[in-house]
Amino acid sequence: ALGQGHTAAKVPEVLFDWIDSGNRLTRTDERYSPEAFDRCRRAHLLDGPLAGKTEVDMWGAGQAGKPWLSWLLAKGFTVRHVVEVSPKKIGTKIHDTPVISDTDLPPPDGTPLIIAVGAAGARELIETDLAQKGYTPGKDAWFVC
């Protein structure tokens, strides 16, 4: 669907709620593992926003971001830089990829920005930062966590 111009977004209000028990199939079956969901996300990225691209930017050099960075590099993408807010990581390299500050993120230029940050509350902060820089989630930037 993303490859056909459709977009995905998180809505601000609860649309449906149900009781979640620990014995649900989605909690016990391997088909619903985090790895299975990552495979699904990756397939949709390759068919959608990454189709025909050779370069990509990334946001997130932590536990959630490093596996995505490794995957992108293994798939042959050139990752121009990884955006990070941790002062310890800014100015270093991870897998030979420069780590830059969020304040150094350039405006959108057609290069997909993949965002892999799992910290609670980070998504909202990143969305605000992206909007100020002219990015539109689902058009210029994609959250994968």
Q: For each predicted feature, which ranges?
A:
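A short, conserved alpha-helix in the catalytic core of glycosyltransferases
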Residues: A1-E13, I19
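C-terminal, non-catalytic tails of nucleotide-sugar-dependent glycosyltransferases
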Residues: T7-A8, N23-E55
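Conserved beta-strand elements of the Class I
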Residues: A9, E55-W59, I114
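Short, solvent-exposed loop/turn segments at secondary-structure junctions
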Residues: L15-F16, N23, A61-G65, G118-A122
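Short glycine-/acidic-enriched loop or helix-start segments at secondary-structure transitions
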Residues: D20, P67-S70, E124-E127
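Glycine-rich adenosine-cofactor-binding loop
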Residues: K53-L73
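Short internal beta-strands
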Residues: R80-V85
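Phosphate-bearing ligand-interacting subdomains
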Residues: P87-C145
